[in-house]
Amino acid sequence: MNNPYIPFASRILDVKKHTQKEYTFRMEYHGEVKPGQFFEVSVPKFGEAPISVSGIGDGYVELTIRRVGRVTNEVFENYVGDSLLMRGPYGNGFDISIFDHGETLVVAGGTGVSPVRGVIEALAASPAAADTHVIVGFRSPADMLFRPDLEEWKDKLDLVLTVD
């Protein structure tokens, strides 16, 4: 078992640009992780930042990062094939099976959609999809994240999308 307090190198498998400031980094990761958990991403000599898991797949996690400070500026200077240091995952995450009975409401806006994206994905693929209501908002069309996911979610869930 890996020690979540010891940093490990994780290779960048893919980078997806959403806006000028928000990118999703697909990071190599072979451990267990649940929707709602986060990693500490560190850049030597610059520091570390807690980044929520925005997607989970076989052999990877996705971290959607907004470029807002020293650490995230340095993260954005890395490309596919480069490695970043990570610690974690931290937090309890969500046991999606508890949502199988009764209605569920998920509300998120802007970059706050990132931490619940994995939860929404899991709910959309579960028996709870018919009873799941999602309200997502963004400041403007240019600020919208996860456009393909939004299209998919509206076919599986009760999705309300607001753009100011």
Regions flagged by a language model, labelled:
Residues 70-164:
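FNR/FR-type flavoprotein reductase catalytic core
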Residues 1-82, 138-140, 164:
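Ferredoxin-reductase
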